[in-house]
Structures are given as C-alpha cells and as structure tokens.
C-alpha cells in the first residue's frame, strides 16, 4: 500500500468536493479547480474525508495511487489557502516593475521583458527586486514562477539572475591568475 495514497484527505469547512466518474471538482473560498484522474482509481467522499483506493497491486496502479491522492490534497489546499512562490532578483540594474496587469523585467538584455500572467495567476511586485506569484493551482503557480526564472537563471560565478527565495545557488570559483 502506498504510504501517501492510503492517508485520507481531510476536507476543511467551506470546501466542497464532488466526484463524477473520474472527474474531481473542488470548490472553496478562493475558487474552483477541476481535474480528471485515472478511471481505475476509486475516489470516495465520506463526510469530511476523501479516500483514494486502487483496484489491485499492479505496478501501473501502484504508481498513480499516491500521485492521485497528492494532487487532490493540493487542489483542496489551493482552493482553501492558495499557493505562493517568491522570486528574488539579484544583479546590478536588474529590476522588476508592475505596469497594469503585466510585469516588466529589466535583466541586462538590450530590451525589457514583458510578461502577462495567465488567467487565475496573480503576480505582485512588492519591491523592485522581488516577485510573488500567487494562485490556487500549485502546478500553474510553479510553472509561471519557473517561466519567469528562466528569463535569467542565476549564474554560478556572481550569482546574478532570478532565483527562488529559498534557492541556494552553488557558486564557482573564478579563474586563478598567473
């Protein structure tokens, strides 16, 4: 039995979960998420708990058992509390600013980079060297944060670039002179 898969997902007050065939819809104070799962997984809602069971111990079913439970738990967490990723910008002249719905990044290129977040994702710029990505879908928040980071990944010599706030950049030593 999967250690993660056999744990029930506790549904907090104010969150409703509906299961139709293999489609799970989670509604909460922050919004609504819908996702289709593998039809072999049995998803049951009993009171304020949701359980995921697999039909047998075949390898294909074992691999998606814990994943299905984790995805549903993230959906419940997202509509209840939401998710956020913080990015830090380091480097001389590197900065971000918000203009209306989009953010403009000056990252040492000959042109500024403009990024408009997708529907359901909110991007804040509290200081010109910090970006906060918020949303109800953990997957989409992580994707947008990774996309913004990819515009200028931290380089190993001086550490300049966009990094996650909890990321540790491994530094390299420069060339040794004669």
Curated annotation (Swiss-Prot):
Pfam families in UniProt: Ribosomal_L6
Gene Ontology CC entries for this record: cytosolic large ribosomal subunit
Keyword set includes rRNA-binding: yes
UniProt keywords, alphabetically: Ribonucleoprotein, Ribosomal protein, RNA-binding, rRNA-binding
GO biological process, one term: cytoplasmic translation
Keyword Mitochondrion found: no
InterPro entries: Ribosomal_uL6-like (IPR000702), Ribosomal_uL6-like_a/b-dom_sf (IPR036789), Ribosomal_uL6_a/b-dom (IPR020040), Ribosomal_uL6_bac-type (IPR019906), Ribosomal_uL6_CS (IPR002358)
GO molecular function, one term: structural constituent of ribosome
Subunit: Part of the 50S ribosomal subunit.
NCBIfam families hit by this protein: L6_bact
Family indicated by similarity: Belongs to the universal ribosomal protein uL6 family.
Role according to the record: This protein binds to the 23S rRNA, and is important in its secondary structure. It is located near the subunit interface in the base of the L7/L12 stalk, and near the tRNA binding site of the peptidyltransferase center.
Name used for this protein in its record: Large ribosomal subunit protein uL6
């Amino acid at each position: 039995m999967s250690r993660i898969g056999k744990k029930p997902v506790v549904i907090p007050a104010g969150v409703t979960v509906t299961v139709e065939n293999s489609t799970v819809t989670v509604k909460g104070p922050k919004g609504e998420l819908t996702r289709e799962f593998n039809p072999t997984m049995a998803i049951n809602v009993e009171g304020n708990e949701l359980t995921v069971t697999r039909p047998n111990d075949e390898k294909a079913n074992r691999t998606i058992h814990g994943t299905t439970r984790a995805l549903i738990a993230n959906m419940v967490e997202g509509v209840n509390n939401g998710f956020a990723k913080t990015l830090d910008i380091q480097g001389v002249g590197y900065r971000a600013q918000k203009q209306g719905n989009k953010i403009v990044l000056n990252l040492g290129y000959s042109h500024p980079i403009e990024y408009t977040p997708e529907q359901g994702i909110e991007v804040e710029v509290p200081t010109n060297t910090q970006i906060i990505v918020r949303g109800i879908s953990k997957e989409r928040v992580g994707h947008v944060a990774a996309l913004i980071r990819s515009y200028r990944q931290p380089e190993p010599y001086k550490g300049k670039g966009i990094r996650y706030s909890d990321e540790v950049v491994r530094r390299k030593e420069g060339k040794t002179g004669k």
